């Protein structure tokens, strides 16, 4: 299966911002999540706090959000940690939305967003103290190239934190290739060290719960954002038991 295109994601992001159904999904599935986050991913406030700790950020540092989408999780992290934020996404619609939404988090002066690819961010070498990627790395045309790009933009000892999935059974052929990634092997191959993979049941429970809540809301009528999530849920719920949600951490040399 080929990687989704920027045009595919433009359509998705256009639907998200106006979707009352998606807002309702998050109210029911993750009531602890601040409403302004409006994620295009499977995060709770507890998971974002875990990511913030793993990034080991200090106020005044720079965080790169790779595959930032509409910006919510990265903007939350910037607000909570006092860092500057640069978000990168290949969807111009997402970048426009993220730029606009920075004001909701009170970080307009410290956040900027640029159109770029996970494998070619156009950021300078050693630009960021840390990098985060929320449910995005597996969409790269080449996850290995994305890992190499993340290392390039990180300063020495910079932290990389990803949220994603891994198979319960390594190499499970029932799953698409992007859900079978061996994260430690991938990141070590890009030169990272101190690679860790953590899974907690509540992270995977949230993933499945978002899909079930979306389906239970019933007929989306003219809500294209909810309709898209329901279609995705029907495709992915049958394979949910084959994967686990993980937070992957690594350190640049």
Write out the residue ranges for each language-model feature.
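Conserved beta-strand signature within the Rossmann-like core of class I S-adenosyl-L-methionine
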Residues: 158-164
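Conserved Class I S-adenosyl-L-methionine
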Residues: 196-253
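N-terminal, positively charged/glycine-rich alpha-helical extensions of SAM-dependent methyltransferases
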Residues: 1-32
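A short SAM/SAH-binding and catalytic strip from SAM-dependent methyltransferases
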Residues: 130-142
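A short acidic, Gly/Pro-enriched loop at the edge of an enzyme's catalytic core
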Residues: 119-130
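Class I SAM-dependent methyltransferase SAM/SAH-binding core
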Residues: 62-66, 70-120
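Conserved alpha-helix/loop element of class I SAM-dependent methyltransferases that forms part
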Residues: 41-59
């Amino acid at each position: 299966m080929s990687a989704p295109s920027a045009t595919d994601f433009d359509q998705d992001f256009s639907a998200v911002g106006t979707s009352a159904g998606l807002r309702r999904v998050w109210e029911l599935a993750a009531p602890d999540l601040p409403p302004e986050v409006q994620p295009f991913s499977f995060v709770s406030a507890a998971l974002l706090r875990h990511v913030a700790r793993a990034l080991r950020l200090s106020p005044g540092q720079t965080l790169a959000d790779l595959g930032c989408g509409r910006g919510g999780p990265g903007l939350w992290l910037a607000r909570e940690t006092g860092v500057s934020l640069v978000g990168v996404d290949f969807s111009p619609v997402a970048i426009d939305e993220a730029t606009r939404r920075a004001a909701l988090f009170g970080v307009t002066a410290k956040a900027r967003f640029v159109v770029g690819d996970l494998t070619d961010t156009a950021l300078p070498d050693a630009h960021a103290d840390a990098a985060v990627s929320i449910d995005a790395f597996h969409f790269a045309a080449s996850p290995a190239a994305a890992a190499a790009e993340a290392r390039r933009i990180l300063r020495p000892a910079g932290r990389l934190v990803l949220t994603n999935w891994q198979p319960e059974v390594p190499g499970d052929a029932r799953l698409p290739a992007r859900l079978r990634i061996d994260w430690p092997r991938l990141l070590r191959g890009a030169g990272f060290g101190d690679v860790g993979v953590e899974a907690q049941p509540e992270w995977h429970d949230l993933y499945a719960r978002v899909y079930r809540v979306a389906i239970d809301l019933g007929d989306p009528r003219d809500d294209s954002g909810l309709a898209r999530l329901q279609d995705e849920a029907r495709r992915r719920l049958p394979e949910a038991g084959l994967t686990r949600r993980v937070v992957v951490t690594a350190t640049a040399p």
